Amino acid sequence: EGTVEPTNLVRVDNNLSEEELKDGWQLLFDGKSMSGWNGTNSKKEPDGWEVADGLLSGFASGNVILTESVYDNFELEFEWKLKKGADGGLFFHVPSTLSLTEILNFGPEMQIIDDQYHPDAAVSNSHVTGAVYDILPPRYVISKPIGEFNHSRIVVSGNNIEHWLNGIKTLKYELNTDIWSQNFNNSLFRENSNFGKSQSGHIAIANQEGQLWLKNIRVRNFLGQ
């Protein structure tokens, strides 16, 4: 099983090719609107988010957006960049009724952070981009400099999760295993017995601090293991 993706062809931002559509990909951001995304409690105009210049931007700290659709087994790809000192994250299988604070404590977070300038990234190797926040570190720290777009991919298949960053598989883990439990029991979330137990729900992207920009967000469902 490879750990490196083939080089992406030049693409038109926020569009899918006929081949991608045939392969089951769905666009989650059209470059023009918030269509397909809500705030918590299905709020149609999420606080702290806007669309400008073909980018979906979280411009105010402490806000989250969730997909209108729910997913169980899926593959998600997106490109992102950060303002200096910013901190965000991606979550999956999230109920629509949770606040950002509740989402942060609900299940695994694929960390997105300024690895160079945000102090939290220096606290632990499980706090850097591509980590499962405070639980598992990535094999590599390969985020691009501030102002450049990164390409992230997450694959969720049952209890098996993969994190990819800029074409490299940086982390592969399985929920509800001895290794997972050992790391979880040493984490900030160890008192939460329901952490990571959900099998279906919304995909959520949080802007916890600063500002982040997103584009080319796409998802496809597949049958799990």
Q: Locations of the language-model features?
A:
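Carbohydrate-interacting regions of secretory-pathway proteins
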Residues: E1-Q225
